[in-house]
Amino acid sequence: MTATVARWVEVHRLAVAGRQPEIARDVGDRVSRVWLPTSRFAAVEAMATATLTLGPDAGSFYDRGWARSATGRPWPALEDYRQALILYRQAGQRGNEAATLSQAGRVYFGLGDRQRALDHYQRALPLQREVGDRAGEAVTLTNIGGVHSVLGDPYRALDHYQQALTITRAVGDRAGEATTLTDIGTVYSNVGDLQRALDHYQQALTITRAVGNRAGEATTLNNVGAAYHRLGDQRRAIDHYHQALTIIRAVGNRAGEAAALNNIGDVYIGLGELQRALDQFHQALAIIREVGDRAGEAAILNNIGAAYNRLGDRQRALHHFHLVLPIRREVGDRAGEATTRYNIALVHRAGGDLDQAIRELERVVDLDRQVGHPGLEADTALLRQLRQQRAEGP
């Protein structure tokens, strides 16, 4: 913590103790702008909660919602955003209302509720256009593109990303331009055009390095690593993941560090080095638990289960998958729950327990329908296949 931030923290403590809400709110906002980008989520939540003891404050609700969302607690986050929205609307702060709608949309997106996410983004967009927030408009267009990308509509995703790219270039938002180029690269990666993906990632890297956006550079390096991973160039993938990891550690982003370690573990799985993969996953798990990210914890436990399954240790695989399920349900991640139940079904199928595999797949298909998952058709086909296999007998 820098000396300046330490002084602000002490001023905030004294303002709360002295019942001086205006000072507490102003200082809390300043400190949150420093802490949120470096994953100091628990500290942001504590400070915002202290400020709120002095009365309702939209900014504190917003900051606390962000912190709670980032640490895997989507429902408390959504309640904070709801409170912030009420106050911003009462104050006529249309720009902040739009920002809050956009953040709430991101939470719903993380929960797998793509339609509700899209609804929030589409409500934010006209507000941003009304107040002339071109940079915010670009971010929201990017978010809308992200929904369409996940829904399996890459061309609609690209259309929104290109609109966002035009705006970021028009307003001179170099960091935003880099983010959008990265997102465009990811669409190309998803449709298998990996060389075009790498071209966009390299453009983004050039910009992030030019503007000194270390966090953005790390994100793009991670994406470059993922592209090389899909190309089968695992050594180059690991090299880029390690470059990202070095930056992430330098900026103190603990959640990002866990994500990078998780990515490295995934590459080791592809290389068949399963014990090294497990070492990376366990390092990531310790960090993600430290920062309190329940959704991230579930994702890493899921990968640990997958690694044990690859090792042929079905009992340990099932143990870890079953650790994942209550967390997925706790955070409301129905899409993630479907993924884990699918993994459980495959373990049971490999072990010859078709009855249990079918029961899990029935739940998978039901969850797929609830969230509009693009894997519904494939999962339904597998369920039919297993039912037919059971009917035919050994």
Where are these regions (language model features)?
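Extended alpha-helical scaffolding segments used for macromolecular assembly and cargo binding
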Residues: 1-71, 79-80, 87-90, 96
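TPR-repeat structural position
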Residues: 5-8, 21, 41, 74, ...
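Alpha-helical linker/edge segments of TPR/alpha-solenoid repeat scaffolds
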Residues: 51-60, 383-394
